[in-house]
Regions:
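N-terminal export signals
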Residues: 6-27
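Divalent metal-dependent hydrolysis catalytic cores, especially in the metallo-beta-lactamase
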Residues: 77-82, 94-116, 132-139, 165-172
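Acidic-and-aromatic substrate-binding clefts and catalytic sites of carbohydrate-active enzymes
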Residues: 84-92, 109-119, 141-150, 188, ...
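Mature N-terminal segment immediately following signal peptide/propeptide cleavage
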Residues: 65-89, 93
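C-terminal segment of N-terminal export signals and the immediately downstream linker at the start
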Residues: 22-63
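H/E-rich (His + Asp/Glu) clusters that bind or coordinate divalent metals
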Residues: 44, 61, 88-89, 96, ...
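Active-site gating/metal-coordination segments in enzymes
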Residues: 44-53, 59, 65-68, 119-236
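Histidine-centered catalytic micro-motifs
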Residues: 77-85, 209-213, 267-271
Length: 385
């Protein structure tokens, strides 16, 4: 799960770089959002150009150019990366209404959970079996003891019987695997202890949503040269010596997919190679059982629209749509605007935390159909049971 979505909703100002924020003490997302907005307004009203902080920078484009509002996707969509954001029946009903209005046919709920926690989420969403799919996590209990594996496999099989259709989101940002609150420090996806679990996923026909590393800016020095500093600081990894770096985690991802060709893997967030799409293309070419979801990496690719559009065109059959940013309609709309329009130099501070301007990629209808729906539909149709 990309927790930055919650930071975006709570208000960026004051969270990054250790600054205090009304959002940190708010009882609800709405209160946090309103409070942070008020704080930012007060700061910017009193700040001079010499004292204005980068975190309070809220530029507005001066260009008189077309602005495209896209309320509904051009083609039907399957969202391959979301989480159980809706906690009540009423919220789930609202989510379905939003999906209807924006053109989302089905959403994958990556619960990251096992046991009773998974069962409870499954029950909550059972009202809409055609609109939501539950994906479970892994049970890493005893991972550091001899004989790990059979227990995790048994719980995976139980979750499948309870309604799980896939696995995710499984994390490894360099310190070891994590599935929700369950952690396995030092055990990475290519560890032999995981072989039986990955093989069972393939045997059960359960695709795996695997999140490796984090964006490149989190690994760089937090200084004036860091292009993504506004978003990087809160999630920084440069101060954690000994972790596997971004490139090393991508190597681990490749070794894992190569060893388990009968298992389908989905690399979350473009495998965090949004800054090096050429390498991601090479990884996809070498691994036919690997897809990449584009969730929560819209702001990272929108600054390079021509190169990103070329990448989407070349690898359209290996990319799947995802959000990972809640379920409100404006959130869906900004993803559609980036993918479909040719808009230039616009800002989006409600969903993203970067300072730079965004651009539409203007993807072809052929690419949109594949990324929005066809790839996911084909991937899901290949499953067993």
């Amino acid at each position: 799960m990309d927790r930055r979505s919650f930071v975006k909703r709570a208000g960026w100002a004051g969270i990054a770089a250790g600054f205090s924020s009304t959002a940190a003490f708010a009882d609800t997302v709405e209160e946090a959002k309103a409070g942070a907005h008020t704080d930012a307004q007060a700061t910017t009203k009193t700040a001079s150009p010499e004292t204005l902080l980068l975190k309070d920078y809220r530029p507005k484009s001066i260009y008189k150019i077309p602005v495209t509002e896209i309320a509904k996707a051009k083609f039907p969509v399957i969202d391959m990366h979301s989480h159980p954001y809706a906690k009540t029946e009423a919220e789930i009903d609202d989510w379905v209404r939003n999906m209807d209005e924006v053109g989302i046919e089905k959403t994958m709920i990556l619960t990251m959970s096992t046991g009773a926690a998974f069962d409870e989420i499954q029950r909550k969403y059972a009202k809409y079996p055609e609109r939501f799919e539950m994906w479970c996590g892994f049970d890493f209990t005893g991972y550091d003891k001899p004989g790990f594996g059979p227990g995790a496999v048994k719980e995976l099989e139980r979750c499948k019987q309870a309604g799980a259709r896939g696995v995710g989101e499984i994390h490894d940002k360099g310190q070891g695997l994590r599935s929700g609150k369950l952690k396995a420090p030092g055990m990475h996806p290519d560890d032999p202890r995981m072989d039986a679990v990955w093989e069972k996923c393939g045997e059960l026909g359960m695709p795996v949503s695997l999140h490796v590393a984090d964006p490149i800016w989190m690994y760089q020095k937090m200084d004036r040269y860091n292009d993504g500093l506004m978003n990087a600081y809160e999630w920084r990894l440069d101060n954690q010596p000994g972790i596997v770096g971004l490139s090393g985690m991508v190597d681990i991802l490749e070794r894992t997919t190569a060893r388990h060709r009968n298992t389908t893997f989905i690399a979350c967030h473009l495998a965090n190679l949004d800054y090096d799409l050429a390498r991601l293309g090479e990884v996809l070419e070498r691994n036919p059982n690997l897809y990449a979801d584009i969730s929560a990496r819209y702001a990272e690719t929108a600054p390079i629209p021509r190169f990103a559009a070329q990448f989407y065109g070349k690898y359209a059959e290996r990319l799947v749509y995802g959000t990972d940013m809640g379920f409100d309609k404006p959130m869906y709309g900004i993803t559609f605007r980036i993918l479909e329009s040719l808009d230039e130099h616009f800002y989006e501070v409600d969903q993203f935390s970067y300072h730079w301007a965004l651009n539409g990629l203007g993807l072809s209808d052929e690419a949109l159909k594949k990324v929005y729906l066809e790839n996911a539909a084909e991937l899901l149709a290949r499953r067993k049971g």
